[in-house]
Amino acid sequence: MIKDNIKLKLTIIGDWNVGKSSLLYRFFNDVFYEQTKLSMGEHFFYKTVLIRGESIDLQITDTSGMEKFRSLNNSFYSNLDGILIVYDISDQETFENTKLWLNEANKLAPKDCIKIIVASKFDLENKVVDSNIVKSYADNLNLKFFETSSKNSINVEETFITLVEDILLKKNYQFNNITKNKNNQDEDFNKKKGCSIN
């Protein structure tokens, strides 16, 4: 019998213009765009990754400007397995606002949803956010923290793969005998339209 791939739903949140879409394009296409031009609204990206010999189907939602108007709602967070909370390392306010985003995610996302704090634009010289403070903040919340650069492809893939691995560990997936994924995931995936990249 052919074994179904594991299916996971992820999203990436944070203030407008912190580099969320650039992280997605680097992870999915291994390209960098200074400015992405997605239309307003949710956009779905799909990718299959191989972890420990198992194929994992990822569906990742990009807010595509919705966060600028704080228009994310309960349905956006429903059924998520993992969340990347992103700030711009050259903008202190965007880091301070990760606390608001984390609070929102804790209220609206499933209780077992894994979260990671992500610094973007690590290639910039004008870093203003103290990495030690962020690391201490993340450690106190028992969250992992990555510094990334979409432009220079620093830690981007590692961040996403770590999130996926932590989700699988949290859900106690056994890699050698997985025959079925979480209930209703196949139906949800098939209903979504968007950017499909393998």
From Swiss-Prot:
Tell me if Acetylation is a UniProt keyword of this record.
no
Q: What is its main location?
A: membrane
Q: Where does GTP bind?
A: 14-21, 62-66, 120-123
Query: Where is this gene product found?
Result: Cell membrane
* Domain of life of the source: Eukaryota
Against Gene3D superfamilies, the record matches this protein to:
P-loop containing nucleotide triphosphate hydrolases
Residue interval(s) of motif Effector region: 36-44
InterPro entries in UniProt: P-loop_NTPase, Rab, Small_GTP-bd, Small_GTPase
User: Where are the Cysteine methyl ester residues found in this chain?
Assistant: C195
The molecular function terms in GO held by this entry are: GTP binding; GTPase activity
> Which GO cellular component term is one of those annotated?
plasma membrane
Q: GO:BP terms for this protein? A: vesicle-mediated transport
UniProt KW keywords: Cell membrane, GTP-binding, Lipoprotein, Membrane, Methylation, Nucleotide-binding, Prenylation
- Name of the molecule in the record: Ras-related protein RabH
Which organism is the protein's source? Answer: Dictyostelium discoideum (Social amoeba)
Organism phylogeny:
Eukaryota, Amoebozoa, Evosea, Eumycetozoa, Dictyostelia
Q: Gene name on record? A: rabH
